[in-house]
Structure formats: C-alpha cells, structure tokens
Amino acid sequence: MSRIGKKPVVVPKGVTVTIDGSTVTVKGPKGTLTRTFDPRIKISLIEDQIIVERTSEEKEVRALHGTTRALIQNMVTGVSEGFSVTLKIRGVGYRAELKGKDLQMSLGFSHPVVIQSIEGIQFQVPSADTVVVSGIDKQLVTQVAANIRRYRIPDAYKGKGIWYEGEQRPLKPGKAVGKGK
C-alpha cells in the first residue's frame, strides 16, 4: 500500500469537490480546477475526505496511487490557498517590471524578454530584482517559473542569473593565477 496514497485528503470548509467517474472537480474561494485521472484508480468522497484506492496491484497502478492522491491534494490546496514561486534576479542591469499583465525583463540581451500572461497565472514585481509567479494550479505555476528561469540560469562563477528564492548553489572558484610555477 502506498504510504502517501492511503492517507485521505481532507477537504477544508469553503471547498466543494465533485467526482464524476475518474474526473475530479474542486471549487474553492480562489477558483476551480478539473482533472481526469486514470480509471484504474478509484476516487470517492466520504463526508469531508477524499479517499483514493487502487483497483489492482499492477506496478503502474501502484505508482499512480500515490501520485493521484498528491495531485488531488495540490488541487484542494490550490483552490483554497493558492501557490506562488518567488524568483530573484541577480546581475548588473538585470531587472524586471510589469507591462500591463505581461512580465518584461532586462537580462543582458540586446532586447527585453517579454513573458505573456497566461490564464490562471499572475505576475507580481515587488522590487526590480524580484518576481513572484502565483496561481491555483501548482504544475502551471512551477512550469512558468522554470520557463522564466531558463532565460538566465545562474552562472556557476559569478552567480548572475535568475534564482529561486532560498536556492543555494556553491560558486566555483575562478582560475588561480600564477600558481604552479
């Protein structure tokens, strides 16, 4: 039995869950999320808890058991609290700003990088070197943050680039000049 899959998902007050076969719809104060899961996983709603069970002991179904439960938990958390990822921009002349709903960044290219706003994603720029990506769908929020980060992955020597908040990477030492002579 999956250690994650056997735990029930508690549905908080203000969140409604509708299960139609293998399709789960979660509505909350922040929005609505719908997702269709593998039919070999049985999903049921008992009082204020979502129970996830598998119908067979095949290896693939066992793997899907915990994954399905985690995805449902993320849906419930997303519509009740939401998700956000904070990115820090490090580098001389690197900065971000909002242009309407779109995010515009100067990252050392000959042109500004513009990221179009996507439905379900909000950008915030509390300071010129900080970008907050938020929304209710965890997968979408983290994917958009990863796509933004891909424009300038942190440099191993100087640390210039786009970092996740709290990310720690050791910087490599530069060339040792004059040694070994």
UniProtKB/Swiss-Prot annotation:
Gene Ontology CC annotations of this record: cytosolic large ribosomal subunit
SUPFAM superfamilies named among the record's database cross-references: Ribosomal protein L6
GO biological process: cytoplasmic translation
Stretches of the chain forming a coiled coil according to its record: none
Pfam families: Ribosomal_L6
Keywords assigned: Ribonucleoprotein, Ribosomal protein, RNA-binding, rRNA-binding
Cross-referenced InterPro entries: Ribosomal_uL6-like, Ribosomal_uL6-like_a/b-dom_sf, Ribosomal_uL6_a/b-dom, Ribosomal_uL6_bac-type, Ribosomal_uL6_CS
Function comment: This protein binds to the 23S rRNA, and is important in its secondary structure. It is located near the subunit interface in the base of the L7/L12 stalk, and near the tRNA binding site of the peptidyltransferase center.
Family listed: Belongs to the universal ribosomal protein uL6 family.
Subunit record text: Part of the 50S ribosomal subunit.
The name this protein goes by in its record: Large ribosomal subunit protein uL6
Protein species of origin: Coprothermobacter proteolyticus (strain ATCC 35245 / DSM 5265 / OCM 4 / BT)
